């Protein structure tokens, strides 16, 4: 999958391309992550990419022209890589909140061009003409779009085929089917007076699967009750709940 990131700080994305699951995917050429600095497309000796906002106010606004040139360059790179469906995504606190359903849709794309804002944001005309989607990672403000972009890339990359060494791990993550994950345990059997649930050491896989589902359902009900209404249960899961509730 092809990713082009429009950013003033390309070095930050070493965290994606050099480490962990996403780093391994990059080394195996499952993903291609290219960072494009809009300063390379700016005019003048100082290569400015920001200016004061019209109408006054604090801070600076990123200029449309260098960003547009950077995006067009990214589209050319995507085309050379054989990509057809490559939307431009702007990471913005005004965007829709990223969730697992959105991530699953991104996985089906050929690639993404991700625009990282800075300062007070970007010229609205750039958004109107070049941005296909706006996404946020939560109702709070960060110094720039780089960290949200890394969250987006990491969440997509781990869902791509052949990225996870154990693909079942990705399937069982929180939110994949709408429920939170179940409690996880490893050695030792006892830690500060707390024991691993006996059922997890029983070797009875059907009972373990039932226990894990009930734990996930109860945890979601307690911590994120608004998610329960969106969950579609299997026939077996409905039976487990019915048995548990008597």
Swiss-Prot record:
| UniProt GO molecular function | tRNA (guanine(37)-N1)-methyltransferase activity
Disulfide-bond pairs as recorded = none
Q: What is this protein called?
A: tRNA (guanine-N(1)-)-methyltransferase
What protein family does this chain belong to? Belongs to the RNA methyltransferase TrmD family.
Q: Mind telling me which SUPFAM superfamilies this protein's record contains?
A: alpha/beta knot
UniProt keyword Cytoplasm, yes or no: yes
Q: What class of enzyme is it?
A: transferase
Give the subcellular location: Cytoplasm
The EC code for this enzyme is 2.1.1.228
Q: What cellular component GO annotations does this protein have? A: cytosol
The record's note on quaternary structure and interaction partners says:
Homodimer.
One Pfam family of this protein, by short name?
tRNA_m1G_MT
The cross-references to PANTHER family, in alphabetical order and at most eight, read: TRNA (GUANINE-N(1)-)-METHYLTRANSFERASE
Binding residues for S-adenosyl-L-methionine: 117, 137-142
Q: Which InterPro entries match?
A: Alpha/beta_knot_MTases, tRNA_m1G_MeTrfase_C_sf, tRNA_m1G_MeTrfase_TrmD, tRNA_m1G_MTases_N, tRNA_MeTrfase_TRMD/TRM10
Catalysed reaction(s)?
guanosine(37) in tRNA + S-adenosyl-L-methionine = N(1)-methylguanosine(37) in tRNA + S-adenosyl-L-homocysteine + H(+)
What biological-process terms (Gene Ontology) are attached? tRNA N1-guanine methylation
Record-linked CDD domains: TrmD-like
Has the keyword Cell membrane been applied to this entry? no
Name the UniProt key words of this record, in alphabetical order. Answer: Cytoplasm, Methyltransferase, S-adenosyl-L-methionine, Transferase, tRNA processing
What biological function has been recorded for the protein in this entry? Specifically methylates guanosine-37 in various tRNAs.
